[in-house]
């Protein structure tokens, strides 16, 4: 039974050690991790580092630097660019390479900004997204083990030609039984826009993302997230997926990914 994504092991200097559970396994390859768990774990360390800064995250960028194995990982966070109004913080994850040497497999950078009262001028580009009746999920990942078991998916009915919409809710905690923050919960599903917005059949094409960039003009609230996503595929094997993100209160931000598109042979 998958009851969390990572188990906390110990500290090693500036690094924290975690054991990756089966809940991190990718639907592309069960030997590597889905992008959302590493994004969420590094977001957690960045939020902990920023706890007394008076700043909050406005953007998260995950760069996947190589295949992330489902094994023990080492994670650290640091201040890349200090500032009282604008600061960049970063985190990286390292894991053993096939030859045994340790290498950095993923990195997250975050812009953190000072907050002030702008409640009287709040503006949203999109009206709130309301969850409707769940539709069938017509792709070959239905029933896939690993990460997809840790998220409750409700794909929505949309008209032909419109962006795909799905509501996602994490089913398990991020680390052990620790309660994740709402931003960490969002990070636990944000990388899934690739699956929500896919324009190709995964049994005919591989379209893996190299990054995930999340912008939030408002911090999320709750455990339910609506993703309205759509992929664009170029003529030379490169694509982009973009999405709007919603919680139960309304529009909260956008996500974008770069895709490597390859035809299966």
Language model features with spans:
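Terminal targeting signals and extreme-terminal segments of soluble enzymes
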Residues: 1-265
């Amino acid at each position: 039974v998958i009851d969390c994504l990572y188990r906390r092991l110990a500290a090693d200097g500036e690094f924290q050690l975690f054991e990756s559970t089966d809940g991190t396994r990718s639907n592309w390859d069960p030997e590597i991790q889905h992008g959302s768990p590493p994004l969420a774990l590094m977001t957690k360390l960045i939020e902990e580092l920023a706890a007394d800064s008076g700043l909050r995250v406005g953007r998260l960028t995950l760069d996947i630097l190589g295949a992330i194995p489902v094994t023990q990982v080492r994670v650290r966070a640091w201040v890349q660019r200090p500032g009282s109004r604008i600061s960049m913080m970063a985190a990286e994850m390292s894991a053993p390479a096939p030859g045994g040497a340790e290498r950095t497999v993923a990195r997250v950078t975050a812009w953190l900004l000072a907050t002030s009262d702008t409640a009287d001028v709040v503006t949203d580009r999109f009206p709130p997204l309301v969850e409707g009746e769940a539709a069938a999920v017509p792709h070959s990942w239905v029933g896939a083990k690993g990460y997809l078991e840790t998220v409750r998916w409700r794909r929505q009915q949309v008209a032909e030609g419109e962006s795909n919409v799905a509501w996602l809710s994490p089913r398990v905690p991020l680390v052990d039984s620790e309660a994740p923050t709402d931003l960490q919960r969002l990070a636990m599903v944000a990388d899934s826009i690739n699956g929500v917005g896919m324009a190709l059949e995964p049994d005919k094409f591989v379209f893996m993302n190299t990054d995930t960039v999340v912008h939030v003009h408002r911090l999320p609230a709750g455990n339910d997230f609506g993703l309205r996503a759509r992929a664009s595929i170029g003529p030379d094997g490169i694509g982009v997926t973009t999405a709007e993100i919603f919680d139960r209160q309304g529009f909260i931000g956008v996500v974008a990914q770069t895709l490597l598109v390859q035809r299966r042979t």
